[in-house]
Amino acid sequence: MRSKFDTQLRELGEKLTLMGAMCEEAIANSAKALLSGDSELAKKLAPLDLEIDQYERDIETLCLRLLLQQQPVARDLRQISAALKMITDLERIGDQASDIAEIIPHLKGRTGSECQAMRPMAEAAIGMVTDSIEAYNKRDLALAKSVIEHDDVVDDCFLSVKTALIDMIRTGHGDAEYALDLLMIAKYFERIGDHATNVAEWVEFSVTGIHKSNEI
């Protein structure tokens, strides 16, 4: 019985890793499309979002089956419970990468300095997603804490970009509609960072049994 349970736990980890990898791919491709003005690449991202959604459903089903059939306790229960929470954030990351991709055609291929200012934020967000999934797989508490701390980097990037874009709108030194589109994209990257932080916090819970909400 335990051998079967361990096999299913490994399957859970593998599926969650694949879902995380798809989220990384979605963010990376949306960032690439943004920074290169590649509308065609942006339009190709919708199927990946659907695949991420399907993985969320599959993992949720597996987690519920494990909870009902195996009645896990302690560490195993935390691992499964954390996975159920994490897939919600990963699915939203996929949605936000897709939302970014949907805006890109409206930018009409423009890749000026305002657009390029998104690069550090995009790279930081991708790195946070990658590290949060790795922390889950390795039960690496230090890496999870590093992701949580790194959220400030994304927030600082967002504030910098937002200030510049609002100033651009206020002074009339540019296309206001273009600036608003970029501001929305920046907000999506900032939210991706928040969701990656949530994932890392659930990793911390799976290892320690403690969550920052103190409601667990």
PLM regions with names:
Residues M1-I216:
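Cytosolic, long alpha-helical scaffolding segments
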